[in-house]
Amino acid sequence: MTRPLIISDCDEVLMHMVVPFAQWVDEAHGVVFQMEDASFANALKRKSCGTPLEAMEVWPLLDGFFTHEMHRQMPIAGAIDAMLRLSTAADIVILTNVGPDHQPRRVDQLAAHGLHFPVIGSRGGKGDPVAALIAERAPTLTVFIDDLAQHHHSVADAAPDVWRLHMVGEPAIADKVRPSRAAHARIDDWGAAEAWIADILRAGAPAPALTTA
């Protein structure tokens, strides 16, 4: 018998990312991370002169962080216990844009904190991977959780019946990120988020359509 499915991002939903990343690039690369709007790349500037990094300089830093520094990441408050409780009522898959190369490290990272769920290391928009998971698993309903608005738009296009929760669990940047118009709710606290998800699982209805234009 199929169950509901929760598809969750990891960074800034389950694990802190930008704060430990900022500490590392400061210490190891002389780069300051100061987020003034929703742009991640524009937040990275050289300490020596204040000029922003080019886009091609950002990806190697992210790759280096996920290769060597994931131990710096700690869970978002309440995330682990909430996911474990929700797993009694739904299947859970972690869909994280670290790419396939870092997928094994993400599996180990989450397992070290007690989360033993399937992990998919994707790249790009999450709509197609979400649609593929739904086709494979045929869940009774699906809830998608992510901190990035573009992924909610992608999922809304590819799988419109999915409930979409916009969550930015890092307090240092939450107020810099506008609520996604493609999400059914914006909740940055796991206590309230767990209650919202649990209500949806109990109701068992597909998500209503949203106007995202």
Model-derived segments and spans:
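N-terminal/domain-start segments enriched in small and hydrophobic, helix-friendly residues
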Residues: A41-R72, R123-I145, A192, W196
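Substrate-recognition "cap/lid" segment bordering the active-site pocket of phosphatases
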Residues: G99-V143, Q150-D157
